[in-house]
């Protein structure tokens, strides 16, 4: 999805760490990928410390083909806004974002794409869902993002696909157990 097999990648884990299991799950998963030795994939863990995350982008970002920031939606938005105030031009980097824990609107995704240096709109953001005891259970795909965006744009599609929804749901792909 993020082409880590083709591009050197810096993954910045901005999920809360410590007693918050989600940040530790993300770190462990990213570390396992890095430890395979199959990819040019590095992981750093500033957690929810926005200033440290921005320092990492400035200091380490130029050394990689792409940067993936993993974080909660509101924190990522803060990073994008603060980065601009701290002299980061997000478009200078190939940025991608890996969200969790909260839903968001397509307007929010558009904001991240436009302001956050995302070059490929259907491959530059992904949201995933899970629980502390089971880990990731489902995630977005480019197809699910297209379906959601079409449904948001066209009311008749929304009512056909999401008949009982009262807000923008996420169509997701299930992650089968054992994979």
What residues fall within each predicted segment?
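Active-site glycine/GP-rich loop and adjacent strand/helix microenvironment
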Residues: 35-179
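Conserved adenylate-forming
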Residues: 1-10
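A short, structure-level motif marking secondary-structure boundaries and short turns
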Residues: 11-13, 94
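Conserved AMP-binding
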Residues: 15-18
